[in-house]
Amino acid sequence: MNSATLTDEQLQSLDARIQSIPIVETLGMKINKLEKGHCEATVPRHKRWDGIYETFHGGMLGTIADTVTCWSILTEIGADAHVATTDFNIRFLRPCHTDVVCKAHVVRIGRTMCLARADL
């Protein structure tokens, strides 16, 4: 994991929070990059996560997008902040037959709500 905009202390705190989330281990998620307001992660494709058409199941892709956008928000508000998804929308443009690279970034930080976007 690398970062040009976060301190070593911030990275360690974020990494500890991320590694404490069970889905990270379950999916084999790897953080490629953490920057202020941005996160990039990779998830390997396994057949056990396929949907009916032998492609990465859409629900799994949604879980990945939700998780990585959360991490991008935590880079802005702190690793110890309490966060929850309140609204979620995803559009599938094509089937996924490969490992997934998810790039998420914060669009807006509000007083009580944050908006983030992910591309897979």
Model-assigned labels for residue ranges:
Residues M1-L120:
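Terminal targeting signals and extreme-terminal segments of soluble enzymes
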